[in-house]
């Protein structure tokens, strides 16, 4: 009897967008896909598509903001399979209508984009250290390279996501664990569909997922794309701060 353990892959935010596309890419025989998402019906639909590809699938609507729930979810996967890959993909964006709502709005964004990353990644770390193997991917954003006034606090939360992944990469390398920061530009999704401003180099979701999968297979520390957007962000970062500040203040904001 084959005793080869299943390869456990955790993906948050898997009911749509990049998370859903990644789930389909990784689905296959010998894989235990553990998926979370906010929309139960879309999540179950994605789970069935992955099962049709031969994967064993666990799909739950546990919020990434639930510390204990995410800990149980991650450790439960590790009890059923070798924890090979954790992709902290869940994220939210948006805007606020009144300064009276500002505090609640900021905390709502950061609870998902910062606390959600910690609640997904941190329980996996000691498990992977004991295994002496595993890979962690944190989905940040191209917005995580500059402090963008029109994207408060989305930009700063993605700064954290990118920096946390890059710090962990160096710290966990001696433990045999690979870590990558994923920094996409504009990708077709329910989130970007709300944007009312031009989105240069808007990329198809399936193509973005393939770039991410290939970058993770190569153990790239920073998976940033598309390259024209990477070049633009790099050039902006070289500007004197007063000029950069002037330009970023005129960038469109999120609604």
Locate each region found by the language model:
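Conserved glycine-rich cofactor-binding loop
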Residues: 13-16
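Conserved glycine-rich Rossmann-like NAD(P)H-binding loop of the short-chain dehydrogenase/reductase
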Residues: 29-46
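Rossmann-fold cofactor-recognition segment
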Residues: 50-68
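Conserved mid-core segment of classical short-chain dehydrogenase/reductases
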Residues: 82, 93-107, 150
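Active-site helix of classical SDR
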Residues: 121, 157
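Residue(s) in the substrate-gating loop at a strand-loop-helix junction
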Residues: 141
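C-terminal helical subdomain
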Residues: 181, 197-232
């Amino acid at each position: 009897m084959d005793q080869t353990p299943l390869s456990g892959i955790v993906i948050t935010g898997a009911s749509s967008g990049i998370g859903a596309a990644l789930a389909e890419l990784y689905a296959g025989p010998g894989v235990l896909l553990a998926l979370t998402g906010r929309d139960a019906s879309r999540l179950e639909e994605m789970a069935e598509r992955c099962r049709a590809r031969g994967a064993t699938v666990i799909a739950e609507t546990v919020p990434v903001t639930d510390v204990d729930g995410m800990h149980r979810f991650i450790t439960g996967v590790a009890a059923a399979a070798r924890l090979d890959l954790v992709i902290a993909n869940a994220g939210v964006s948006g805007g606020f209508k009144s300064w009276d709502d500002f505090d609640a709005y900021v905390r709502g964004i950061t609870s998902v984009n910062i606390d959600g990353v910690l609640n997904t990644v941190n329980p996996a770390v000691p498990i992977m250290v004991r295994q002496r193997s595993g890979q962690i991917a944190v989905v940040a954003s191209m917005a995580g390279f500059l402090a963008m006034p029109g994207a408060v606090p989305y930009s700063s939360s993605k700064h954290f996501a990118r920096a946390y992944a890059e710090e962990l990469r160096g710290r966990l390398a001696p433990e045999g664990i690979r870590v990558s920061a994923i920094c996409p530009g504009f990708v077709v999704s329910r989130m970007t569909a709300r944007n009312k401003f031009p989105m240069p180099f808007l990329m198809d979701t399936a193509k973005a997922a393939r770039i991410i999968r290939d970058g993770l297979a190569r153990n790239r520390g920073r998976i940033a794309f598309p390259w024209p957007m990477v070049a633009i962000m790099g050039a902006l970062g070289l500007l004197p701060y007063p000029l950069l500040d002037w330009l970023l203040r005129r960038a469109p904001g999120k609604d």
